[in-house]
C-alpha cells in the first residue's frame, strides 16, 4: 500500500477494472472504502465486507462496521453470518443480526448480501439460512467468502435459488476463475458472481463472442 491515506495500488486497479468492464460493484477493504468511493466518483458501486471471514464479531460490532462503511461511501455491505450460532441452531440470533444490519444499511440506501459460508453448513442449514436471510430483509444470499475450505458449487447455488423468492438474489463466490464457471453459475440461478479474475474472464468472453460462440 502507498503511505498516508492513499488507497492500495491493487485496490485502485480493481476500481479501474470495475469501471472498464461495467462490473456490478467492486469489493474493497473497509479501510479504503472512502478513498475508493472518492476515486470512482459515482461511476461504480463500492462494496465492503463485515464480520469477515467467520462472522464471529458481535452484532454491535458488525452494526458499527456497517454504519461506518456506508458513511464512508459503501453502496453494498457483504456480511458473514455468525457461523457458529447457525450450526448451533440459534436461528433467532442469526435472523436478528441480519435484520439489524439490513435495517441500518437500507435506511442509507445500501444493499446487503448475506454470506453463508456454505462449506461449513449442511444442506438443511443452508436452506434455513436462506429463509432467515429473506425474512430479515436481505437483498442477496451469497455462497462463500473465498476463505473457507471450499467455495461456490453448482449444487449450492441451485439449493439457494430454490430456498428464496424472486425478491432475493443469489451470488456465487469462491473459486470462480473462468467463463465456463460463470455461465454455469448463472444457469444454476446466480444473479452475480464474485471473481478476482475479471480481466481473464472478460477476455475469454470477448474471444468467444468474436467467434460467435457466446
Segments (PLM) and residue ranges:
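Glycine-rich phosphate-binding active-site loops on the catalytic face of alpha/beta enzymes
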Residues: 48-52, 71-86, 135-151, 172-209
Amino acid at each position: 500500500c502507498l503511505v498516508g491515506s492513499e488507497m492500495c495500488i491493487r485496490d485502485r486497479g480493481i476500481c479501474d477494472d470495475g469501471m472498464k468492464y461495467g462490473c456490478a460493484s467492486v469489493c474493497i477493504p473497509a479501510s479504503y472504502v472512502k478513498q475508493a468511493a472518492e476515486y470512482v466518483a459515482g461511476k461504480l458501486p463500492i462494496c465492503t465486507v463485515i464480520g469477515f471471514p467467520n462472522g464471529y464479531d458481535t452484532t454491535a460490532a458488525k452494526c458499527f462496521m456497517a454504519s461506518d462503511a456506508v458513511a464512508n461511501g459503501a453502496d453494498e455491505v457483504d456480511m458473514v453470518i455468525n457461523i457458529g450460532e447457525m450450526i448451533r441452531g440459534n436461528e433467532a440470533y442469526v435472523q436478528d443480526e441480519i435484520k439489524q444490519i439490513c435495517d441500518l444499511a437500507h435506511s442509507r440506501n445500501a444493499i446487503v448480501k448475506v454470506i453463508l459460508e456454505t462449506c461449513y453448513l449442511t444442506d438443511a442449514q443452508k436452506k434455513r439460512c436462506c429463509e432467515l436471510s429473506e425474512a430479515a430483509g436481505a437483498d442477496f444470499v451469497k455462497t462463500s467468502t473465498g476463505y473457507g475450505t471450499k467455495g461456490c458449487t453448482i449444487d449450492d447455488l441451485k439449493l439457494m435459488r430454490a430456498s428464496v423468492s424472486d425478491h432475493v438474489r443469489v451470488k456465487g463466490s469462491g473459486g470462480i476463475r473462468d467463463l465456463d464457471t460463470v455461465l454455469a453459475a448463472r444457469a444454476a440461478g446466480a444473479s452475480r458472481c464474485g471473481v478476482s479474475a475479471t480481466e481473464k474472464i472478460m477476455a475469454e468472453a470477448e474471444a468467444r463472442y468474436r467467434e460467435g460462440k457466446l
